[in-house]
Amino acid sequence: MNKLQAAYVTGNAHKWLCTPKGSAFLYIREDRRTLIRPLSISHGASVDGNINEKIRLEFDWTGTQDPTPWLCIPKSIEFVGSLSDKGWEGIMNHNTNLAISARNTILEVLQTPKLCPDSMIVGLSAVLLPNDNVPLTSALEADPFHTLLYEKYNIQVPVFAWAHHNRRYLRTASFLYNSLEEYQYLAEVLEKEI
């Protein structure tokens, strides 16, 4: 994090690290720590002291909570990294290459433009769905196309409406347990249903 020099970094560990949901991290650069408070506070809120002590008191004990998801992170990093002969670098290369192949396979069918260059893809890719004049749903509702893909074909893939663009997007995620054949199946279904 020091090399990155970011003021703040946060991320979920459940997707790529295969840890339980709720296992996330928050990094706050030391010069920013006085600016950040937890949503719910505990006894640490009234304690005076240096910021390194205070931030731990405020964030670490915010009520009754099971710390198991966080405690899984180190072992998960080690275990998942061991699934490739090339460690995490090999896993990320695999995910990136599969995500690009998945996107390209789908774009061949949809004939919609690439949304970004390959260099911006790591493990996720998004494709623009054809402008099919389907009314956009609220962010709180499941998109009807998402529901159709899931119920009729057992495909779980997010479909998002973006009202600002008046368009919908389909997003894929690629990991070690995915195969190109799954994305080819998705492309066949898209060709049939769109």
Q: Model regions: which residues?
A:
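Short acidic/glycine-enriched loop/turn segments that link adjacent beta-strands
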Residues: 20, 121, 165-168
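Short Gly/Pro-enriched turn/cap motifs at secondary-structure boundaries
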Residues: 14-17, 62, 116-117
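Conserved PLP-binding catalytic core of the aspartate aminotransferase-like
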Residues: 92-100, 107-152
